[in-house]
Curated annotation (Swiss-Prot):
Pfam families: Homeodomain. SMART domains: HOX. It is found in: Nucleus. The gene is Ubx. Its main location: nucleus. A motif (QA) lies at residues 232-247. One of its GO terms (cellular component) is nucleus. This is Homeotic protein ultrabithorax. A motif (Antp-type hexapeptide) lies at residues 146-151. Residues 159-218 bind DNA.
Length: 253
């Protein structure tokens, strides 16, 4: 009874219950007052088994490895800004985060049965999985490779040839020759190919295209002439109809 009023039992209870057991802690604490030191709840209990000590040591080691891995990641991110070095450092950091057996969910639930123990590593045990799931989102490779089959294909899946461009001098000489002859002989084609630094095939294709262009021009001129004739015929018919109407409206006496 006298222990409740002693100085060591009222104000000096902290020094007493640290060295003693659970009974001394309760005996040195007044029932009518609230204790103002919450860290006393985290004191090890006397009935803890050696397995609890090994679990705490393993989780402490795991937390230390996580801090070391985070330091490596921050260091690599500061040195290299292009992203590839950070990715390698991130992978090496994940390799170091090997989850011990004590940090499994089963061990966490079994250890949480004691209400007086705190588990500060509960969130850290779930870090590697979340980081691994977020890694492919942050480092998605961009596919900008160009392959030959991506070019514009021609007939039968073959690659289309580029369009030949002619200089003004070459075009002028070809137009002058086409104005004289629409069809070239083999000898004349060879002479023009040597004179204009072109191949016989290019000369032949140019003349074919030029003849087709001339044919379209002639066809367009014919269509214009036909439209002109039709327009003149309609005008003549309209004029004749107007004259006939005028003649019917004013008969001759």
């Amino acid at each position: 009874m006298n222990s409740y009023f002693e100085q060591g039992g009222f104000y000096g209870a902290h020094g007493v219950h640290q060295g003693g057991g659970g009974g001394d802690q309760y005996r040195g604490f007044p029932l009518g007052l609230t204790y103002a030191q919450p860290h006393a709840l985290h004191q090890p209990r006397p009935q803890d088994s050696p397995y609890d000590a090994s679990v705490a040591a393993a989780c402490k080691l795991y937390a230390g490895e996580q801090q070391y891995a985070k330091a490596d990641c921050s260091k690599a991110g500061g040195e290299q800004q292009n992203g590839y070095g950070g990715k390698e450092a991130w992978g090496s950091g994940l390799g170091a985060l090997v989850r011990p057996a004590a940090c499994t969910p089963e061990a966490r639930y079994s250890e949480s049965s004691s209400p007086g123990r705190a588990l500060p590593w509960g969130n850290q045990c779930a870090l590697p999985g979340a980081a691994a799931s977020a890694q492919p989102v942050q480092h998605q490779p961009t596919n900008h490779t160009f392959y030959p089959w991506m070019a514009i294909a021609g007939a039968n899946g073959l690659r289309r040839r580029g369009r030949q461009t002619y200089t003004r001098y070459q075009t002028l000489e070809l137009e002058k020759e086409f104005h004289t002859n629409h069809y070239l002989t083999r000898r004349r084609r060879i002479e023009m190919a040597h004179a204009l630094c072109l191949t016989e095939r290019q000369i032949k294709i140019w003349f074919q295209n030029r003849r087709m262009k001339l044919k379209k021009e002639i066809q367009a001129i014919k269509e214009l002439n036909e439209q002109e004739k039709q327009a003149q015929a309609q005008k003549a018919a309209a004029a004749a109809a107007a004259a006939a109407a005028a003649a019917q409206g004013h008969p001759e006496h």
